[in-house]
UniProtKB/Swiss-Prot annotation:
<dbReference type="GO" id="GO:0019509">
    <property type="term" value="P:L-methionine salvage from methylthioadenosine"/>
</dbReference>
<protein>
    <recommendedName>
        <fullName>Methylthioribose-1-phosphate isomerase</fullName>
        <ecNumber>5.3.1.23</ecNumber>
    </recommendedName>
</protein>
<comment type="pathway">
    <text>Amino-acid biosynthesis; L-methionine biosynthesis via salvage pathway; L-methionine from S-methyl-5-thio-alpha-D-ribose 1-phosphate: step 1/6.</text>
</comment>
<dbReference type="GO" id="GO:0005634">
    <property type="term" value="C:nucleus"/>
</dbReference>
<comment type="function">
    <text>Catalyzes the interconversion of methylthioribose-1-phosphate (MTR-1-P) into methylthioribulose-1-phosphate (MTRu-1-P).</text>
</comment>
<keyword id="KW-0963">Cytoplasm</keyword>
<feature type="active site" description="Proton donor">
    <location>
        <position position="260"/>
    </location>
</feature>
<keyword id="KW-0413">Isomerase</keyword>
<feature type="site" description="Transition state stabilizer">
    <location>
        <position position="180"/>
    </location>
</feature>
<dbReference type="InterPro" id="IPR037171">
    <property type="entry name" value="NagB/RpiA_transferase-like"/>
</dbReference>
<dbReference type="Pfam" id="PF01008">
    <property type="entry name" value="IF-2B"/>
</dbReference>
<keyword id="KW-0028">Amino-acid biosynthesis</keyword>
<dbReference type="InterPro" id="IPR000649">
    <property type="entry name" value="IF-2B-related"/>
</dbReference>
<comment type="similarity">
    <text>Belongs to the eIF-2B alpha/beta/delta subunits family. MtnA subfamily.</text>
</comment>
<dbReference type="InterPro" id="IPR011559">
    <property type="entry name" value="Initiation_fac_2B_a/b/d"/>
</dbReference>
<dbReference type="GO" id="GO:0005737">
    <property type="term" value="C:cytoplasm"/>
</dbReference>
<dbReference type="InterPro" id="IPR042529">
    <property type="entry name" value="IF_2B-like_C"/>
</dbReference>
Length: 366
């Protein structure tokens, strides 16, 4: 799905922008034939890449959260399908449909995965071409999911960076806050919200980033802190419950978050705790920005009421690194995501331009 306007804000993008690739971690390794993904459950203590050979492997690493982040799981799901096609050249449309639906169930809230793999269906339904031609087109499409994510991510980060410069004219350095992990470990490039923080740092415009630990899966302390330490980016780690006090006492300029699903009206589903930050931003008069690829915007739903929220196992809340930290009989509610209403959002920053939620829907093709 492409918007009506393809806009690079204040372009062209200089070659120097985020040019130093050694400053970021690699979430996967892919040479066209073999795929290995970084097992993020082992971070920060061990860096281990594990093979993904087919759809079943892709499902397992996504479901278990060995890989996570909306853009990354879309790529891993797509490459899993590609490797499946490479192993088995027999094109059975019903079997492929089943594999697509199977992949989607691995993380049902994440619309990027759904959008990416269901993009095969129009190809499969094309009339007047042979099965071999359909297979070739499917393989080309799935590979493009991977290559396009890299290209569009750079545009996304440039657009978001330019929005901050425009929203805060004359400001030399920014103090920001983020939740979860939205960096290179959530994408195949620099990231979304955390990528903007990396861009600010690379341009010498970052004062400090406050990073929420992000319970119960601890993506902030395990993943985001690991990325920022690797890139020598100034940050402070805080617990989720410290966010309000940090906003009151440390003159934040904005909160930058990612998203797994954005409705047509701008309602935004993201990691649990994001809604809390948006409410706090409203109270403290702080700008609140989801930073998302346009593929995360779901043209099929009108509001956040239609977003399915994944609920995960009680053990994820009761255990840390496998160690039981509470009574195993505790009743638990563990939603993985929440939905931030559009009226709490300053702008949604995308690779096709930056819009207020009210203006966003006008850009979405029907």
């Amino acid at each position: 799905m492409a918007p009506k306007i393809n806009k690079i804000v204040n372009g062209p993008i200089p070659d120097s922008f985020l040019a130093d690739e050694t400053k970021r971690l690699d979430s996967l390794k892919f040479d066209g034939q073999r795929l290995e993904v970084l097992d993020q459950l082992l971070l920060p203590h061990e860096f281990k890449y594990i093979p993904v050979n087919d759809v079943s492997d892709a499902f397992n690493v996504i479901k278990s959260m060995q890989v996570r982040g909306a853009p990354l799981i879309a790529v891993v799901g797509s490459l899993g399908l590609l490797l499946e096609f490479n192993k088995n050249s027999e094109l059975n449309i019903e079997t492929i449909r089943e594999k697509i639906e199977y992949l989607i169930t691995s993380r049902p809230t994440a619309v990027d995965l759904r959008n990416s793999v269901t993009g095969l269906i129009p190809i499969l339904e094309t009339e007047g071409i042979t099965d071999d031609e359909k297979l070739a087109k499917c393989q080309e499409y799935l590979l493009n999911v991977y290559t396009a994510e890299k290209l569009q991510n750079r545009i996304l980060l440039w657009n978001a960076y330019q929005e901050l410069l425009t929203a805060f004219p004359g400001k030399e350095k920014f103090t920001v806050m983020t939740i979860c992990n939205t960096g290179s470990l959530a994408t195949v490039s620099w990231g979304t919200a955390l990528g903007v923080i990396r861009a600010l740092h690379s341009e010498n415009r970052l004062n400090l980033a406050y990073v929420l630990e992000t319970r119960p899966y601890n993506q902030g302390i395990r993943l985001t802190a690991t990325e920022l330490l690797h890139g020598q980016v100034p940050f402070k780690l805080i617990t989720d419950s410290m966010a309000a006090w940090a906003m009151k006492n440390h003159q934040l300029d904005c909160v930058l978050v990612g998203a797994d699903n954005v409705a047509r009206n701008g309602d935004t589903a993201n990691k649990i705790g994001t809604y809390m930050l948006a409410v706090l931003c409203k109270h403290h008069n702080i700008n609140f920005y989801p930073v998302v690829p346009f593929t995360t915007i779901n043209k099929n739903i009108s509001s956040g009421e239609e977003i399915k929220i994944e609920e995960r196992a009680a053990s994820e809340l009761l255990r840390v690194n496998g160690v039981l930290v509470g009574n195993s009989e505790c009743p638990v509610w563990n939603p993985a995501f929440d939905v931030t209403p559009a009226h709490l959002i300053t702008k949604i920053l995308t690779d096709f331009g930056n819009w207020s939620p009210a203006a966003l829907e006008e850009q979405i093709p029907r």
